[in-house]
């Protein structure tokens, strides 16, 4: 395991009524994370999310050293589904008029049906190969980008 400020941690954001149930899973490395990713009940969580509306299942890995996150959510239905992959990172926004420059949490999102592409994104993320990760993203469908919402409240499961 990587320790201190160089560690990776991850959590499961489960489909639930409030859409806020987060199960912190603790520290991880690439091999252990990929096992958890493969064993996550994606389709069961997708069905719950579709029943409840306005919620989704998401797995997020945080890199404490770079203050970045890579996450995956599922959308669609059991027979026809895909994934949204998001990369959160600090981005400096230039000020306009009298506003100063500021750093925000930014997210870029991509869509894919190919789990092997997602696995490769996580491999590059754990290696901290950001250039390689961006190149891998460019092979996916660009879904959008925006300032990320910071959630201060995480109920524990």
Please name every model-derived segment.
Residues 42-45, 49, 130-134, 145:
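Residue-level signal for secondary-structure boundary elements
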Residues 134-155:
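Short, highly charged C-terminal tails/helix-capping segments
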Residues 2-67:
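Negatively charged, low-complexity tracts enriched in Asp/Glu with abundant Ser/Thr
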Residues 30-39, 72, 85, 153-154:
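Generic hydrophobic, helix-prone segments enriched in Leu/Val/Ile
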Residues 3-24, 66-113, 120:
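Intrinsically disordered, low-complexity regulatory segments enriched in Ser/Thr/Pro
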Residues 26-38, 100-138:
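Ampiphathic alpha-helical segments that act as solvent-exposed interaction surfaces
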Residues 3-6, 153-157:
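Aromatic/basic-lined ligand-recognition segments
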Residues 63-68, 130, 146:
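Short alpha-helix boundary/capping elements
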């Amino acid at each position: 395991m990587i320790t201190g400020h160089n560690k990776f941690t991850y959590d499961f954001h489960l489909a639930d009524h409030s859409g806020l149930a987060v199960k912190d899973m603790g520290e991880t490395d690439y091999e252990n994370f990929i096992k958890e990713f493969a064993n996550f009940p994606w389709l069961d969580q997708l069905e719950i999310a579709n029943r409840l509306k306005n919620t989704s299942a998401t797995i997020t890995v945080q890199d404490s050293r770079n203050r970045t996150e890579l996450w995956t959510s599922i959308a669609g239905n059991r027979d026809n589904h895909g994934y949204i992959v998001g990369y959160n990172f600090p981005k400096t926004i230039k000020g306009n008029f009298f506003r100063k420059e500021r750093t925000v949490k930014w997210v870029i999102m991509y869509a894919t049906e190919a789990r092997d592409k997602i696995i490769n994104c996580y491999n590059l993320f754990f290696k901290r190969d950001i250039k390689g990760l961006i190149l891998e993203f460019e092979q996916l469908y660009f879904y959008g980008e925006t300032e990320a919402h910071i959630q201060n409240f995480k109920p524990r499961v």
